[in-house]
Amino acid sequence: MGKDKNPRRVAENEAMAKTRMLRTSPQKLNLVAQMIRGKKVDKALADLTFSHKRIAVDVKKCLQSAIANAENNHGLDVDELIVAEAWVGKNLTMKRGRPRARGRFGKIIKPFAEITIKVRQVEEQA
C-alpha cells in the first residue's frame, strides 16, 4: 500500500536535461536554443562549439548532459538522437542600483534564465 511510483515525464524514446541559473537574459538564451532545435545532436554540438555567443558554452554542457542521460539512463542510441525540444524560461532577477546625477538612483536589472533540452531517438529512413 505504498505510494505509487512517479510516472515518467518523458516518452520511452526521449531523455532530457535542465540547466538553471544561467546568467543571461531569456531572450539571448532563446537565440541559441533556436539554433539547435530539430537538428541531429552531432550537428547541434558542432554549431554550439563554433558559435560566438557566450552562453553557447553552457547550452552545449546541457545538451551533452541530455545525451549522456539518453545513453546511460534510458539506453538510447546516440547516433540516432535529435534535439526534439529546447525551451527557455525566466529565473530570478537580481536588482542592483547605480548612483546617478542630482541624487537619483538608476536601476540595473541582472536577469537569470533556464533551459530545458529534450532529445529523441528517431529511426533513420532507408
UniProtKB/Swiss-Prot annotation:
GO process annotations (BP): translation
Q: Establish whether keyword Ribonucleoprotein is in the entry.
A: yes
Q: Which domain of life is it from?
A: Bacteria
In the UniProt record, the signal sequence range is: none
Molecular function via GO: rRNA binding; structural constituent of ribosome
Sorted alphabetically, which keywords does the UniProt record give? Ribonucleoprotein, Ribosomal protein, RNA-binding, rRNA-binding
InterPro entries listed in its UniProt record: Ribosomal_uL22, Ribosomal_uL22_bac/chlpt-type, Ribosomal_uL22_bac/org-type, Ribosomal_uL22_sf
Q: Oxidoreductase as a keyword?
A: no
Q: Name one GO cellular component term.
A: cytosolic large ribosomal subunit
Q: How does it assemble?
A: Part of the 50S ribosomal subunit.
The similarity comment for this entry is: Belongs to the universal ribosomal protein uL22 family.
Per the entry, what this protein does is: This protein binds specifically to 23S rRNA; its binding is stimulated by other ribosomal proteins, e.g. L4, L17, and L20. It is important during the early stages of 50S assembly. It makes multiple contacts with different domains of the 23S rRNA in the assembled 50S subunit and ribosome.
Protein name (Swiss-Prot/TrEMBL): Large ribosomal subunit protein uL22
**Gene behind this protein:** rplV
